[in-house]
Amino acid sequence: MKARVPFIVAMLCGLAWAGNLESCASRCHEKFNRDAVCQCDRRCPQHDDCCDDYEHLCTAEEGPPEPEAFLDPEDKIPTSHLYSAPSSCQGRCREAYDKHHPCHCNDRCPEFGNCCEDFDSLCGGDHEGFSHSSDAVTKEELESISETIYRVDTNKAQKEDIVLNSQNRISPSETGNQVDRSPEPLFTYVNEKLFSKPTYAAFINLLNNYQRATGHGEHFSAQQLEEQGVFLREVMKTAVMKELYSFLHHQNRYSSEQEFVDDLKNMWFGLYSRGNDEGDSSGFEHVFSGEVKKGKVTGFHNWIRFYLQEKEGLLDYYSHNYDGPWDSYPDVLAMQFNWDGYYKEVGSVFIGSSPEFEFALYSLCFITRPGKKCHLSLGGYPLAIQTYTWDKTTYGNGKKYIATAYVVSSSQ
């Protein structure tokens, strides 16, 4: 009889455990459990497999949810492109120490005697516009300035300005299926009076200046170059960009507003080659207007561009795999769509933001966290922006162009 006691206890424990797998008691936000009858992870509402008590037990005292991952595989730049010459300081001045590099270009390399041979010629002296190690921007400072930018964006859309019809939401595993699950357009209504505001009008004037196919060189007329200048002048009049400049100036990144504007023009509008032709792409074209490379849509992270192309019948909205937690604009949507015959697997965009808001956040992250995930806070909710540098060619004294910038998950 005694020999059977452990067996009976084990069976009872097993039954108790099986019972737990039908409830979220002590399981809130655990990882996906394939042995469970129902789930309690953060994605279970999306996959419709939550336990019956998930909402009661796991969401009642929950803080602002973090965005789920919505990767954009078409935007990823191979690591080999981040540094074209690790034995040189070309495009690497003031970068963080990396033990994998044979020589270094940070402020302390002279102290340790491990600078690259061209450090003095490329990085020596007082190079304005570069941050020194003592001027490093903290995560808390990024969260604070992003909240400030969010607060002062008076040109953003109001709730009544945009009516969205987001329709079908899919799981991340389905984004590559290329199935149109939404019979209606994404935008039911947009108040186009927004587009008469100076920054919107200047932004829209830039969108028809590009050929979307890579491999075809971009050639700008005098008028088109002036349109770039008008856009920069208009955004710099806004509180959003004034706050950004003030922040970067106090961080010793720029000594004057003109230096800042000149750098913005180079990093965003400077041409480089993604294809076989010289000067067929730029950061602005890729991020805001969108490109087609090897039969797929790349970039295209702007709601105004999306709306205008959808209105013309050139864009077909398929589905979305992420909808942000914000109950006002700007919001974030990660979606799938067909752009006049070419598919975008995951395109994350701010919805209802002003042009200067996006331009400011992407610039902030590129300047302070180039090639990295940049953690921000908007209205109390976390989100992150991923940027990548393009330095097969550089400008100025080895500075890098923007390859891409887009919203990603805030979780690591």
Swiss-Prot record:
Entries under InterPro entries matching the protein: ENDOU, EndoU-like, EndoU_C, SMB_chordata, Somatomedin_B-like_dom_sf, Somatomedin_B_dom
Domain of life of the organism encoding this protein: Eukaryota
Active site positions, chain numbering: H286, H301, K344
S-S bridge residues: C24-C28, C24-C40, C28-C58, C38-C40, C38-C51, C44-C50, C51-C58, C89-C93, C89-C105, C93-C123, C103-C105, C103-C116, C109-C115, C116-C123
Pfam families, alphabetized: Somatomedin_B, XendoU
Domain EndoU, chain residue ranges per copy: 138-411
Main location per the UniProt record: secreted
Tissue: Specifically expressed in T-cells during apoptosis. Expressed in surface heat stable antigen (HSA)-containing T-cells populations (CD4(-)CD8(-)HSA(+), CD4(+)CD8(-)HSA(+), CD4(-)CD8(+)HSA(+), and CD4(+)CD8(+)HSA(+)) and not in the HSA(-) single positive T-cell populations of the thymus or spleen, suggesting that expression is lost during T-cell maturation and is absent at the most mature stages of T-cell development.
Reaction equations catalysed: ribonucleotidyl-uridine-RNA = a 5'-end dephospho-uridine-RNA + a 3'-end 2',3'-cyclophospho-ribonucleotide-RNA
Signal peptide: 1-18
Domain (SMB): residue spans on this chain: 20-63, 85-128
Location(s), subcellular: Secreted
EC number per UniProt: 3.1.-.-, 4.6.1.-
Keywords annotated in UniProt: Disulfide bond, Endonuclease, Hydrolase, Lyase, Manganese, Metal-binding, Nuclease, Repeat, RNA-binding, Secreted, Signal
Any one cellular-component term (Gene Ontology): cytoplasm
Record-level GO BP terms: female pregnancy; immune response; negative regulation of lipid catabolic process; post-transcriptional gene silencing; proteolysis
Entry cofactors: Mn(2+)
UniProt GO molecular function: lyase activity; metal ion binding; polysaccharide binding; RNA binding; RNA endonuclease activity; scavenger receptor activity; serine-type peptidase activity
Family statement: Belongs to the ENDOU family.
Subunit text: Monomer.
Function of the molecule: Endoribonuclease that cleaves single-stranded RNAs at 5' of uridylates and releases a product with a 2',3'-cyclic phosphate at the 3'-end. The UU and GU sites are more efficiently cleaved than CU and AU sites. Targets mRNAs to regulate their expression.
Protein name from the UniProt record: Uridylate-specific endoribonuclease
Native source species: Mus musculus
The encoding gene: Endou
